[in-house]
């Protein structure tokens, strides 16, 4: 077991809770606000200490680039009690990996399936239905990078602020969702990209799923 200070354990539980509830880790600013730090730099110092101890991995250059590492079998709740985790063999999912999506065809059509991954379902905030290979860097500041595998749960509707997989005409995109009346904005997490605006009365739009987690592969 990795030995952590009380503050480090608090931050680690905060990261876990954020991933469980939203599918994504918190930003440094969010950690600082939650724990009453004066600046995001204080949160960064604690994150670096957690990384040195092997509790997390940090991806440079992204505000949400925090990855939990397996610390072996237990975690603490807010009262400090130790909670047992299910055995990994009982927590496996077989998820199809969707690559490029052909225009006009269902996202889970057989020709889009590049592979099948056997993964631990405890990695995700909700049970996903498929993995989508991310193309491009428009969601960089949410910690979603080109080539990442986004875990997606199929949905019919979404809440403002959630990260979704959306189909607009013949294109499939990953963006943050915002709806006002019949107008939808698909918001990037990178200032180099512009929002996509959708008029439901005129545009061909559909939600393909909700992002519930992320996997990164290294060559």
UniProtKB/Swiss-Prot annotation:
Q: Name one GO biological process term.
A: proteolysis
Q: Which residues form a coiled coil?
A: none
Entry keyword set = Autocatalytic cleavage, DNA damage, DNA repair, DNA replication, DNA-binding, Hydrolase, Repressor, SOS response, Transcription, Transcription regulation
Catalytic center residues: 138, 175
Give the reactions, separated by semicolons, that this protein catalyses: Hydrolysis of Ala-|-Gly bond in repressor LexA
Q: Which GO terms describe its molecular function?
A: DNA binding; serine-type endopeptidase activity
Q: Residues annotated as DNA-binding region?
A: 28-48
User: What superkingdom heads the lineage?
Assistant: Bacteria
Report the EC number(s), separated by commas if there are several: 3.4.21.88
Family assignment from sequence similarity: Belongs to the peptidase S24 family.
On assembly, the entry states:
Homodimer.
HAMAP family named in the record: LexA
Q: What does this protein do?
A: Represses a number of genes involved in the response to DNA damage (SOS response), including recA and lexA. In the presence of single-stranded DNA, RecA interacts with LexA causing an autocatalytic cleavage which disrupts the DNA-binding part of LexA, leading to derepression of the SOS regulon and eventually DNA repair.
- Return the protein name: LexA repressor
Q: Which gene encodes it?
A: lexA
């Amino acid at each position: 077991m990795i030995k952590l200070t009380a503050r480090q354990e608090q931050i680690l539980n905060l990261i876990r809770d954020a991933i469980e509830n939203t599918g994504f880790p918190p930003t440094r600013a969010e950690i600082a606000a939650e724990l009453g730090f004066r600046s995001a730099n204080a949160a960064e110092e604690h994150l670096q200490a957690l990384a040195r101890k092997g509790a997390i991995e940090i991806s440079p250059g992204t505000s949400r680039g925090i990855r939990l590492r397996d610390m072996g079998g237990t975690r603490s709740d807010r009262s400090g009690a130790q909670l047992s985790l299910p055995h990994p063999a009982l927590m496996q999912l077989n998820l199809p990996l969707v690559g490029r999506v052909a225009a006009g065809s269902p996202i889970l059509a057989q020709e889009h399936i590049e592979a099948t991954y056997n993964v631990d379902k405890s990695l995700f905030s909700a049970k996903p239905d498929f993995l989508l290979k991310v193309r491009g860097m428009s969601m960089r500041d949410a910690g979603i990078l080109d080539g990442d595998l986004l875990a997606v749960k199929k949905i019919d509707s979404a809440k403002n602020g959630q990260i979704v997989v959306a189909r607009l005409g013949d294109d499939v995109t990953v963006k943050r969702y915002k709806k006002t009346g019949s107008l939808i904005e698909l918001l990037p997490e990178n200032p180099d990209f512009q929002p996509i605006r959708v008029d439901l009365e005129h545009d061909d739009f559909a939600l393909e799923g909700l992002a519930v987690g992320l996997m990164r592969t290294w060559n």
